[in-house]
A protein has these predicted regions:
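RNA-binding accessory domains that recognize and position tRNA/RNA substrates
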Residues: 1-22, 32, 147-149, 155-173
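N-terminal Rossmann-like NAD(P) cofactor-binding module of classical short-chain dehydrogenase/reductase
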Residues: 26
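Flexible loop residues that form catalytic
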Residues: 30, 135, 145
């Protein structure tokens, strides 16, 4: 896809990230409780969302995005671990086979109105994907980079790249 990727620490401030002149932000996976990481990550993510940059989060990045947008997270009774987890794409109506490794989830109850649920687990109906209704900001709970099925989730990267190309045309930097 010919993307230039710059990796920064999760504690890098928004100003330093914006000085890199990104066309998009990828919120990666990682271990642990999203609320603990959120103490320093949420203010950074809020500033990046205000810049109207495309943002794509996976796993912990998905949970942090949810927290940033006003959702709550909780520890699951039974985490999702392994391959072959069926997830329904609520926009397209199809089922994707995913790989997962998480023990926390975004809570459905009292979800802010600016969040659209895009994906749902067929095992327990937990939220597997969200998007911000007004901006090119979205995330999934699972690992689309692992390609457990016949590239079931490659479209997520294509959507993100399309958003970054559109953003690059704005020549904001």
């Amino acid at each position: 896809y010919n993307c230039k990727v710059t990796v920064v620490s999760c504690k890098t401030n928004a100003g330093d990230i914006l000085n890199l002149k990104p066309n998009g932000i990828f919120l990666s996976n990682g271990p642990g409780d999203p609320a603990a990481t959120g103490k320093y990550a949420i203010p950074i993510i809020k500033k990046l969302i205000k810049m109207n940059l495309p943002i794509f989060g996976i796993c912990l990045g998905h949970q942090l995005l949810g927290l940033t947008l006003g959702a709550k997270t909780k520890k699951m009774n039974l985490g999702h671990r392994g391959a072959n987890h069926p997830v329904k794409n609520l926009i397209k109506g199809n089922v994707e086979i995913t790989s997962q490794n998480h023990g926390f989830e975004i809570v459905r109850k009292n979800l802010p109105k600016n969040i659209q649920i895009t994906h749902q687990s067929l095992f327990d109906n937990s939220i597997e994907g969200i998007k911000l209704k007004s901006k090119p900001v979205f995330s999934v709970q699972y690992h689309p980079e692992s390609n457990p099925g016949p590239q079931d989730s490659v479209y997520l990267f294509e959507e993100f790249i399309k958003s970054m190309k559109k953003n690059a045309k704005k020549k904001r930097y």
